[in-house]
Amino acid sequence: MLALINRILEWFKSIFWKEEMELTLVGLQFSGKTTFVNVIASGQFAEDMIPTVGFNMRKITRGNVTIKVWDIGGQPRFRSMWERYCRGVNAIVYMVDAADLDKLEASRNELHSLLDKPQLAGIPVLVLGNKRDLPGALDETGLIERMNLSSIQDREICCYSISCKEKDNIDITLQWLIQHSKSQSR
């Protein structure tokens, strides 16, 4: 009976109460940022993704939550834009190619450099280790260690190992994002 009442309450909330959140998606080139946006928006995976030049903005609705996603290019010439697009968002999603171990140091340095910016203090960060379906890809424990995530103490930080191709852990990623649309009012 209680479950039925909860479902009815959720249904009423979905009709009368809409949530909006804004997030910025950053990370090195070829980590899978645009692919991630396409997977959460449409459920579709495409092998032949064109690298983002500059930025793309996309609105995605899941239930009663509309997520405005800023997908920022990861090439070196666009990294100076990351801070500007991260200001005032509900969350920063940092994408890592968990199978490209040669780029992990550069990725770690870029993440820590970004999070050192005073204007971004306190904004929650979700680190996604993409391409877990590839051989040698790091899991969450490996990512936390190699990206030195435990040293980040001034904000909430979460890390998931995902595969956009296989759609692994996309559901828990969306749950985290939706939870942060409700807990943050920026």
From Swiss-Prot:
SUPFAM superfamilies, A to Z: P-loop containing nucleoside triphosphate hydrolases (SSF52540)
Phenotype of null mutants: Lethal from late larval stages. In garland cells, results in defective late endosome-lysosome fusion and inability to form a rapidly exchanging terminal lysosomal network. In motor neurons, results in defective anterograde axonal long-range transport of lysosome-related vesicles which leads to defective protein localization to presynaptic active zone and synaptic vesicles. Fully mature presynaptic vesicles containing synaptic vesicle proteins (e.g. VGlut) and presynaptic active zone proteins (e.g. brp/Bruchpilot) accumulate in the soma of motor neurons.
Tissues where the protein occurs: Expressed throughout development, from embryo to adult stage, in different tissues such as larval motor neurons, salivary glands, testis and ovaries (at protein level).
Matches recorded under InterPro entries: Arl8a/8b (IPR044154), P-loop_NTPase (IPR027417), Small_GTP-bd (IPR005225), Small_GTPase_ARF/SAR (IPR006689)
Gene Ontology CC: one annotated term: S bouton
Gene: Arl8
Cell division found in the keyword field: yes
Species annotation: Drosophila melanogaster (Fruit fly)
Assembly behavior: Interacts with tubulin. Interacts (in GTP-bound form) with Rilpl. Interacts with unc-104.
Top-level division of the source organism's lineage: Eukaryota
Name by which UniProt lists this protein: ADP-ribosylation factor-like protein 8
Family to which the UniProt record says this protein belongs: Belongs to the small GTPase superfamily. Arf family.
